[in-house]
Amino acid sequence: MKMTFQPKKRQRAKVHGFRQRMKTAGGRKVIAARRLKGRKKLSA
């Protein structure tokens, strides 16, 4: 068996990236919550 995590920069950004988050209401809430918490990184 292979490892389950096969990292890909493009796929990570497409699924968890900032632009992807901003597309949905829920994603915008995620960004807002992370801003309030003071996260250095808002998204992948």
Swiss-Prot record:
This is Large ribosomal subunit protein bL34. One of its GO terms (cellular component) is ribosome. Pfam families: Ribosomal_L34. Gene3D superfamilies: 1.10.287.3980. One of its GO terms (biological process) is translation. It comes from Agathobacter rectalis (strain ATCC 33656 / DSM 3377 / JCM 17463 / KCTC 5835 / VPI 0990) (Eubacterium rectale). One of its GO terms (molecular function) is structural constituent of ribosome. Disulfide bonds: none annotated. Belongs to the bacterial ribosomal protein bL34 family. Keywords: Ribonucleoprotein, Ribosomal protein. The keyword GTP-binding does not apply. Residues 1-26 are annotated as: Disordered. Residues 7-22 have a biased composition (Basic residues). Coiled coil: none annotated. The gene is rpmH.
